[in-house]
């Protein structure tokens, strides 16, 4: 059984007060329309048609690389007119119609609407809400059958009391659309061609109207302004947090937790407040994430502790390692088992060996550090010569004293010691002590300058 999909995305969204179309506002780091497209793609439709209008190039660019046909609605004359523009690009089969600004709609709800709507039926997704203000109302006859959909601006006082609303999501065969769409008239307050008029045509043609409802009310909520966008963001994040907690993870405050990508979790993890997940992140078992941390495209293995105010990006933190507080692990780092990236330590493109420690105030860039090394406070691997990056290699059991600079390319041998305050420009052999600093002198004849006092 084939399926075509039409996504309406021509609106300007003036209440957003933005230079972007409304459907390109973001929720959980994805545009609104990307959320909708992702949901319908799981239905495996034969084709997806997106009707664009305001700033159409931006919408097309945002969806580049997907199997989508774009149709331009030059004049925004209403939803019925928008679907009419898409009609030539649809196959002779059922058509699912929905909006590009309903980001929380689930594949399951759409699938239920499609599956329960026969080829000769009209399927309508409706919902019961406590506050229907601004939404089209579902009008039923005394037998409970749907007779029409009335937009709020065209509704009378009795109709405005109705709590059942139109979600704007329909399923109908192309043959019926070909018959009904040209018959729509703009005889309403807005002087627009409303897609909702197909309900009236269905009744006149004795077409059965199949009504389904969403699993959760929030799934059908649209976005018209930034306040609504912020509210939906919290709904989305709360829903994600609850799914994660159901897998055996404790979250200190689900209202202060953001997933802006995909999070794969083990059991018995603890996530403190204001943690942000970006891209693809995987947590092992018994992981502790402190407050105000940002994790992006990384793997955190079992029993790792990421202390507060730390960032891990594009790296892997091995079992039992500790990061933070106030640490930054940049892309292409591999922090081995039991290693420590301490407070105010930054690492980039670095391997920190098993059991090695850089406990505080250190920069490790383009480095390969062996096992059980000690990197003292204030150590810098100077990897950049102004043109190219160079590598620092430190062998197992090496000890790098505080406030030392290692000028790459340089190798520190296994078991070697670098004295505090040294600037190392040559390789240090294994088990050697390297000291590079001026000899301390005491000058007993020296006198401190004295400031002259005013007479």
Swiss-Prot record:
Q: What does this protein do?
A: Catalyzes the last two sequential reactions in the de novo biosynthetic pathway for UDP-N-acetylglucosamine (UDP-GlcNAc). The C-terminal domain catalyzes the transfer of acetyl group from acetyl coenzyme A to glucosamine-1-phosphate (GlcN-1-P) to produce N-acetylglucosamine-1-phosphate (GlcNAc-1-P), which is converted into UDP-GlcNAc by the transfer of uridine 5-monophosphate (from uridine 5-triphosphate), a reaction catalyzed by the N-terminal domain.
Q: Does the keyword Cell membrane apply?
A: no
Subunit text: Homotrimer.
| Protein name (record) | Bifunctional protein GlmU
- Source species, domain of life: Bacteria
Please give the cofactor(s) recorded in the UniProt entry for this protein.
Mg(2+)
One Pfam short name? Hexapep
Q: What UniProt keywords are attached to this protein's entry?
A: Acyltransferase, Cell shape, Cell wall biogenesis/degradation, Cytoplasm, Magnesium, Metal-binding, Multifunctional enzyme, Nucleotidyltransferase, Peptidoglycan synthesis, Repeat, Transferase
Residues given in the record as acetyl-CoA binding sites: 377, 383-384, 402, 420, 437
Query: Which species is the source of this protein?
Result: Francisella tularensis subsp. holarctica (strain LVS)
Pathway noted in the entry: Nucleotide-sugar biosynthesis; UDP-N-acetyl-alpha-D-glucosamine biosynthesis; N-acetyl-alpha-D-glucosamine 1-phosphate from alpha-D-glucosamine 6-phosphate (route II): step 2/2; Nucleotide-sugar biosynthesis; UDP-N-acetyl-alpha-D-glucosamine biosynthesis; UDP-N-acetyl-alpha-D-glucosamine from N-acetyl-alpha-D-glucosamine 1-phosphate: step 1/1; Bacterial outer membrane biogenesis; LPS lipid A biosynthesis
Question: Where, in this chain's numbering, is Mg(2+) bound?
Answer: 101, 224
Q: Where is the active site?
A: 360 (proton acceptor)
Q: How is the cofactor bound?
A: Binds 1 Mg(2+) ion per subunit.
**The reaction(s) this protein catalyses:** alpha-D-glucosamine 1-phosphate + acetyl-CoA = N-acetyl-alpha-D-glucosamine 1-phosphate + CoA + H(+); N-acetyl-alpha-D-glucosamine 1-phosphate + UTP + H(+) = UDP-N-acetyl-alpha-D-glucosamine + diphosphate
Question: Where is this chain's protein located in or outside the cell?
Answer: Cytoplasm
The family this protein is said to belong to = In the N-terminal section; belongs to the N-acetylglucosamine-1-phosphate uridyltransferase family. In the C-terminal section; belongs to the transferase hexapeptide repeat family.
Region described as Pyrophosphorylase: spans on this chain: 1-226
Give a Gene Ontology cellular component term annotated to this protein: membrane
Q: Which GO terms describe its biological process?
A: cell morphogenesis; cell wall organization; lipid A biosynthetic process; peptidoglycan biosynthetic process; regulation of cell shape; UDP-N-acetylglucosamine biosynthetic process
